[in-house]
């Protein structure tokens, strides 16, 4: 079952600020995620139904939430790994 993709308004602004190369890398991973969004190794324990996409080379993290009732993957936050910025933003936006 393929999930649809949605963005939190603040995450969409972050997406638009990204460089083209990073955006293309994340887009490629998001396409894979829409077919199988619940990858246990990428699950975030502190945030319910949330998972991460890591770009190791650039240090970016994308946090998404899986909503099974709507068959939707919602991008919650995109930011650098430094000081866990992406995870902190996601926690604030979901609380």
Where are the regions that the model predicts?
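Arg/Lys-rich, positively charged N-terminal/basic patches that mediate binding to nucleic acids
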Residues: 1-28
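A short, surface-exposed loop/turn module that caps and links secondary-structure elements
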Residues: 31-55
